[in-house]
Each structure stands twice: as C-alpha cells, then as structure tokens.
Amino acid sequence: MHTTYNYSPNFELKKRKPDQIKFIIFHYTGMKKESEAIERLTSIKSRVSCHYLIKNNGEIVVMVPDLYEAWHAGVSSWKNFKSLNKNSIGIEISNPGHELSLIHI
C-alpha cells in the first residue's frame, strides 16, 4: 500500500485528544476527475477536507493528520454527538458517483 501526503489547509488548528475520535465516516468524491477532487480538498476557498483520500489506484493520500478536525461532515449529528467533525476521521473514496439526480431516486 502506497501512502503520499498532500495536506489540506482546511482543518481546525486546535489538536484533539485521541479518545475524542469515535467514528469513521466514508464519503465519495462525486467528481468526474480525481485531480479535481484533490484540488477541491486542498483549496482554501472550498473550506472542505478529509483525513484520507483513497485514489482509484489504491494509493492513500493523507490530507489532515488524525489529531486535527478535518472539515468533512458539515452540520451533522449521530445519537448524542453533534458536529461529527470533532469526533470522526473522514475518508473520501475517489468515485464519480452516479448519473442520476437525487430527484429520480
């Protein structure tokens, strides 16, 4: 397994404690080109990030170190947890998504 680093500027600067991490949240990029997804995840203008990106070739890209809060879950909650960015590791899977709009599902 090959790992590279391409750090995103989009994360909370205050470190969290390892025991604060309770969840792993998987997302897919939903973009046709992997390079566009990487550009978005590393652009300060986008204000989104993840801890890890799994590329199409299986390579893992580290974007935010685990002890920092990446901006991947937005306004979120699960059971008694609110703002899941604080308590989770965000993993993006490079994937263009689907051709259907959500209206048709």
Language-model regions: role of each:
Residues 69, 89-101:
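Cell-envelope and extracellular/periplasmic
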Residues 103-105:
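Conserved small/polar residues in nucleotide/adenosyl-binding loops
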Residues 50, 87-89:
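Generic beta-strand structural signal
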